[in-house]
Structures are given as structure tokens and as C-alpha cells.
């Protein structure tokens, strides 16, 4: 049984009208079940088949589903759940195939907390630490860190953990200590080009 990776994909189209067209096109690929499967109409394989971007759906990784798609301004937003890692090939190559005369910018961030896997091609997230406070029972630590999931810069996180542990240890040592003593996952967003996930 895989761990599930949640990926937020943002497609910059340049115009609101084109964003609406792209969003509608992606949605239309999910209305028809191109291949029998256990995921339903929103299976990534249906997108691969119905977009006509692939001779066979097996030519692309598609173990997952498109959970949501919407246009907002000049951008199209997609939420994808997939096994272990991002699987964006069906959508990205499908859109490029459907709109060959257009050039799009693709930005994504993906998280699979079970394996502390966080990757992105967004420069503003790279190097930020993702703090997952789910399950922290230590009230004093929760008070310092705050409740919820969020991204934090190195300086802030170092200050909070050094204050909590009354220590001047390095951030890496403190993160290991928090994981061991509190079961908290703190890891940083790594840069990974989108090409790594559209094969």
C-alpha cells in the first residue's frame, strides 16, 4: 500500500480566457472513463487517454487522481493525489498537446508527509522548512511553534527551537531531537525540476 503524495500544480496561462479554456479542457478529460480502473473518472490514466497525448496510458505514470481543477485569474490550479511522488505527466503533456501554439509556466509543490518528502520548483519555497505539528502532545512546544502546518525560514525555526530546548545546538541537531522526542516532522523543501515528474 503506497503513501499518498498531494501535489498542487499551478499552470500560468497568461490570460483569464485561456485559463478558463485550459481548466475546462482538463475537466472534460475526466468526464469519460477511457480505461476501466479502480480510481474512477478522475484517474490520471483517463486524462492520458482522453487528451490523446499518449499512444497508450501506460506510456506515462498515472497512479493517482485529479482531485480538483479550477481557473483563478490567469492561472489554472490542479490538486493531484498520487502514489509516493508527484505524477504530473498526464496533465502537463495533455495540456501541451491540446494547446500546441501556447507556452505555459508550470509550478508545483508536492508533499508526502509519511516519508517526510517535500519537493517543489517554486523558488519561494526552496530552503524553507515545513513544520508538521500534527500529533504534538507537548503543550509547551506547541505554544512555541504554533498549531498547524506551515513553512518557516531557517532563522525563525532555529530561534524557536533553541529557545524551547534552552540550547545553542545547530538547527539540524535540534530537528533530530524534536523528531526523536516529540515525533514531529520538520524537513525542508527541496528543489526538483518539474521535468522529473512529467515522464
Regions flagged by a language model, labelled:
Residues 1-199:
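Long, contiguous binding/interaction regions
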Amino acid at each position: 500500500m503506497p503513501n499518498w503524495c498531494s501535489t498542487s500544480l499551478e499552470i500560468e496561462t497568461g490570460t483569464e480566457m485561456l485559463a478558463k479554456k485550459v481548466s475546462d479542457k482538463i475537466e472534460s478529460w475526466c468526464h469519460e472513463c477511457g480505461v476501466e480502473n479502480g480510481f474512477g473518472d478522475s484517474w490520471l490514466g483517463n486524462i492520458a487517454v482522453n487528451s490523446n497525448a499518449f499512444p497508450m496510458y501506460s506510456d506515462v505514470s498515472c497512479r493517482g487522481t485529479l482531485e480538483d481543477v479550477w481557473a483563478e485569474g490567469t492561472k489554472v490550479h490542479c490538486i493531484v493525489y498520487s502514489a509516493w511522488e508527484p505524477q504530473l505527466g498526464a496533465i502537463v503533456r495533455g495540456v501541451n498537446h491540446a494547446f500546441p501554439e501556447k507556452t505555459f509556466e508550470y509550478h508545483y509543490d508536492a508533499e508526502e508527509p509519511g516519508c517526510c518528502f517535500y519537493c517543489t520548483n517554486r523558488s519561494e519555497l526552496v530552503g524553507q522548512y515545513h513544520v508538521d505539528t500534527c500529533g504534538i502532545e507537548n503543550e509547551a512546544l506547541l505554544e512555541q511553534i504554533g498549531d498547524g502546518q506551515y513553512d518557516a525560514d531557517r532563522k525563525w525555526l532555529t530561534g524557536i527551537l533553541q529557545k524551547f530546548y534552552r540550547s545553542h545546538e545547530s538547527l539540524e541537531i535540534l530537528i533530530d531531537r524534536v523528531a526523536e522526542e516529540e515525533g514531529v516532522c520538520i524537513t525542508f523543501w527541496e528543489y526538483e525540476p518539474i521535468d522529473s515528474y512529467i515522464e
